[in-house]
């Protein structure tokens, strides 16, 4: 389906817009998130968040380049998830004691 028709579905508030977006760009968005996160579940969550944010933001906005708009949102959510996962307090490292410290 063409981007203009998908965007028109969003403006009509048709839930079919999300289905058409997923059918057209779902694999590309998943691959984009997967390259950033290297985790299937987190990638699926980023794509779902992308669809939700698209549903919330498109009626006032009409993006000229629909895939670029979706990719920007997906990248934003994936990088946010990556930052959250790699936060210093959540990342534990095991360090072995040296001989001097064992005494």
Predicted regions span which residues?
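Sigma70-family region 2
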Residues: 11-12, 38, 48-66, 84-85
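Arg/Lys-rich amphipathic alpha helix in sigma70-family domain 2
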Residues: 72-94
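Acidic, Ser/Thr- and Pro/Gly-rich low-complexity regulatory segments
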Residues: 2-6
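Acidic, proline/glycine-rich intrinsically disordered inter-domain spacer in sigma factors
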Residues: 90-92, 99-103
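Hydrophobic recognition helices of helix-based DNA-binding modules
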Residues: 29, 33, 54, 58, ...
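A short, charge-rich alpha-helical start-of-domain segment used by transcription regulators
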Residues: 7-31, 35
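Residue-level preference for hydrophobic side chains embedded in well-ordered alpha helices
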Residues: 21, 25, 29, 50, ...
């Amino acid at each position: 389906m063409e981007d203009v028709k998908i965007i028109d579905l969003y403006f009509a508030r048709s839930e079919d817009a999300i289905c058409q977006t997923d059918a057209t760009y779902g694999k590309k968005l998943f691959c984009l998130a997967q390259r950033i996160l290297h985790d299937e579940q987190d990638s699926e969550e980023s794509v779902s968040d992308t669809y939700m944010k698209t549903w919330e933001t498109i009626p006032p906005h009409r993006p000229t380049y629909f895939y670029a708009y979706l990719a920007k949102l997906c990248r934003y959510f994936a990088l946010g998830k990556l930052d959250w996962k790699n936060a210093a307090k959540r990342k534990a490292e095991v360090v072995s004691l040296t001989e001097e410290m064992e005494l």
